[in-house]
UniProtKB/Swiss-Prot annotation:
Keywords per UniProt: Endoplasmic reticulum, Heme, Iron, Lipid biosynthesis, Lipid metabolism, Membrane, Metal-binding, Microsome, Monooxygenase, Oxidoreductase, Phosphoprotein, Steroid biosynthesis, Stress response, Transmembrane, Transmembrane helix
Any one GO CC term of the record: endoplasmic reticulum membrane
Full protein name: 7-alpha-hydroxycholest-4-en-3-one 12-alpha-hydroxylase
Protein source organism: Oryctolagus cuniculus (Rabbit)
Source lineage: Eukaryota, Metazoa, Chordata, Craniata, Vertebrata
Class of enzymatic activity (EC top level): oxidoreductase
Organism superkingdom: Eukaryota
């Protein structure tokens, strides 16, 4: 009994110690409105976690375009005016940090212990190998991998034109993940075994993916924590650098980064964890984004017609003979403005990343309105462009409606002029983040999604099992984690177009 009493007293002291900073914190002059919530230390964490979008809508209506909220003992200052994003993203005073925050996150999620300079190394490797000639080579590898995944090792089979049924999300995610994995991490001489391994990794990845949001928020139960640990260990083994000698065709991008880590003395076991991190970064969003692109095309026949007409005009009539693989003139990916607009509109509606910057020293932020806000050292400045940019009706009229030509000028060129309150705005969409946290692989990600959509509209017949099926809603549990996922899948039928 004495022991339990001592433990209870100790627990009360610990809880009190955790809650004390939140209880004592008060709003200082020039600081944004402070909303600590009614629960000590937790603050608004549970409401935020339940539906981030609705929570931020409520806070903005209550406090305006800038406010600070308490979430699990940490204070986040949300800036909701996109015209005021510039000073935060450029950070000329070097008082806002992203790298240290990211290091803590990747250590928790992937087990990777960052070293000095590796954030810069990733961006340099991406500039060299995911743009220009490097991107051309990777696009070729991706086309080969898509052919392998979608057609099999022998190319088009005699019964390839029979109908298949699947969930569209499962289909898109599976194809994009497996093809992307093989393109980046390499393959062996046994193509069938490569496909089996890619399928195994995809199944495990999807399980980790389902647990991911609650894992990041530390909301897993004991059994789920153990499962996450097992999955992490499994990925470290499956992606181990010890398997590299067995593989051909590892991308120069991955090879460049692993060579750097080796030269810096990073142990092979830590390189395995780096590979897991890069698998997530490269494959966690392209499949879901491809799903949204195809479901919008299926639900908007005028958009589907426009994409097909453009594809035929640029690529010609497709023809896939028996035992052939897909052939696409990859340079055409730079000359398809209609599909570019479709993808940009898809990402506007379906990509919802959160941008974080940790305040290193007190800083005065001047808003576009002229208001000056004092940001406190240790707080986290947060941008959520989905709400403040993508869904702003001033920037994008009818923001919840899919318009395939939203990003096209009347002459068919790309539209880049968007306005808020009559002022031209630089950040009119932000699906890839921005500034130091912009996605370094965005050009390859966009290329592989465009390539997949082109293959689907050119070589396949694709239809909804139920033509009246609506576009499914977004799963609110994933707000803030890159490309969103649907609450449920949608059944489709697909087949290779018959040979004439």
């Amino acid at each position: 009994m004495v022991l339990w009493g001592l433990l209870g007293a100790l627990l009360m002291v610990m809880v009190g110690w955790l809650c004390l900073p939140g209880l004592l914190r008060q709003r200082r002059p020039q600081e944004p409105p402070l909303d600590k919530g009614s629960i000590p230390w937790l603050g608004h964490a549970m409401t935020f976690r339940k539906n981030m979008l609705e929570f931020l809508k409520h806070m903005r209506s209550k406090h305006g375009d800038v406010f600070t909220v308490q979430l699990g003992g940490q204070y986040f200052t949300f800036v909701m005016d996109p015209v005021s994003f510039g000073p935060i993203l450029k950070d000329g005073q070097r008082k806002l940090d992203f790298v240290e925050y990211a290091k803590g996150l990747v250590l928790k999620v992937f087990g990777y212990q960052s070293i000095e300079g590796d954030h810069r190394m990733i961006h340099l490797a991406s500039t060299k190998h995911l743009m220009g000639h490097g991107l051309e080579e990777l696009n070729k590898a991706m086309l080969d991998s898509l052919s392998l995944v979608m057609l099999g090792p022998e190319g088009r089979s005699p019964d390839a034109s029979r109908w298949h049924e699947d969930g569209l999300f499962h289909f898109c995610y599976g194809v994009m993940f497996k093809a992307g994995y093989l393109s980046l991490f390499g393959h062996t001489s046994d193509k069938r075994q490569d496909l089996l391994q890619a399928e195994e990794i995809f199944i495990k990845f999807r399980r980790f993916d389902l647990l991911f949001p609650r894992f990041v928020y530390s909301l897993l139960g004991p059994r789920e924590w153990r499962e996450v640990g097992r999955l992490q260990q499994l990925f470290h083994e499956l992606l181990s650098v010890k398997h590299n000698p067995e593989k051909d065709g590892m991308s120069n991008w991955i090879g460049h980064m692993l060579q750097y880590l080796s030269e810096q003395g990073v142990a092979p076991a830590m390189q395995d964890k780096f590979n897991f991190m890069m698998l997530w970064a490269s494959q966690g969003n392209t499949g879901p984004a491809s799903f949204w692109a195809l479901i919008y095309l299926l639900k908007h026949p005028e958009a589907m017609r426009a994409v097909k007409e453009e594809a035929t005009r640029v690529l010609g009539e497709p023809r896939l003979e028996a035992k052939q693989s897909f052939t696409v003139q990859l340079s055409a990916l730079q000359h398809i403005p209609v599909l570019d607009s479709v993808m940009e509109e898809t990402l506007r509606l379906g990509a919802a990343p959160t941008l974080y910057r940790v305040v290193q020293k007190d800083i005065l932020l001047k808003m576009a309105s002229g208001q000056e806000c004092l940001l406190r050292q240790g707080d986290i400045v947060t941008l959520f462009p989905y709400l403040s940019v993508h869904m702003d009706p001033d920037i994008h009229p009818e923001p919840t409606t899919f318009k395939y030509d939203r990003f096209l000028n009347p002459n068919g060129s790309r539209k880049v002029d968007f306005y808020k309150a009559g002022q031209k705005i630089h950040h009119y969409t932000m699906p890839w983040g921005s500034g130091v946290s912009i996605c370094p692989g965005r050009f390859f990600a966009l290329s592989e999604m465009k390539l997949f959509v082109l293959l689907m509209v050119q070589y396949f017949d694709l239809e909804l099992v139920d033509p009246n099926t609506p576009v499914p809603p977004i799963d609110p549990r994933r707000w803030g984690f890159g490309t969103m996922q649907p609450t449920h899948d949608v059944r489709i039928r697909y087949r290779l177009k018959p040979l004439e």
